[in-house]
Amino acid sequence: MDVLSDMLQNPILSEYEHQREKNVILEELAMTYDQPDAYADMLIDQTLWPNQPMGRDVGGTKDSVISISKNSLADYHNRQYGPENSVIAIAGNIAHSVAINETEKLFGNWGKASPLDWHRVQLPESNAPRVTIGNRRTDQAHLALAMNGVSSTDPRKYSMSLLNTILGEGMSSRLFMEMREKRGLAYDVASHASHYKDCGALTAYCGVDPSKIDETLVVLQNELGKISIDASEEELSNAQAFATGRLYLRLEDTRAVMSWLGGQELLFNEVKTPEKVVDEVRSVTIGDIRSVAREFLDPRFYKLAIVGPYRSQGRFKKLLAA
């Protein structure tokens, strides 16, 4: 804690270190742009949340990184890093009184901050299907098909998470079984649900032979369409067991417990116990699953990002409208 408090309250932020770290980040960005799957992830965020921070890569762009001066970085640190904008979470073999005393000793004189205003996500006026193409000469086409989801405070969050588990999480998921095991279209195929402070998304991803991109997109949409009709009690039960088992397994790690406590306190001003979360996961019904599937897995609202040897959006817009 002594080292961490010194880093937070008294960072050196030298010009030399500033320039060196900028070079490191520029190399990280170059690596991301060179990885088609990572680039597809970047493009789908831009497609879901265009022209706003939520849709931009957290690493920035080459131009934005180069433009950051040492003084602007120091100003950002002074505004954002302070007790009003921080949570100190401690997990492990330590008495509560000792943790409080150490925190007061090391952070008691931490100067006040003036955190930047938070701006809510603005969804586009038109929620019609959108397609973004990243033209690359690749041996494999990478596609991400997404739709807006629910936020981390939405009571349907657990329904959406379990829907995602049934759809594309793990080797027994629908997408894995249909697209890899049955049809042999893809090696890497999965879906994931994201829940942020005021928005969310559900995204399906796969990498396929460029000549099979049309077939893949048709099969993928068929799977998304079926789940609101035939999601089963057995699938839900398996997804609930998977989710609760994974939660308890993760919390065997002390660092994960620390993140569990700190993250909830910082974002929600409350900390749910694991038991409370498990109860909420187990309370989800098959009706809840089908309901969120009908509402959010609607082809009228699909967003598609593709990285591969393509230029025209037209053929893919037609496939989304089919």
Question: Residue locations for each model-derived region?
Answer:
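Charge-rich, well-structured scaffold segments of protease-associated domains
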Residues: 1-116, 122-124, 133-134, 138, ...
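Short amphipathic alpha-helix segments
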Residues: 174-182
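A domain-level signal for the structural core that forms small-molecule/cofactor-binding pockets
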Residues: 145
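Flexible, small-/acidic-enriched active-site or ligand-binding loops
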Residues: 129-130
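A conserved active-site cap/scaffold subdomain adjacent to cofactor or substrate pockets
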Residues: 157-171, 175
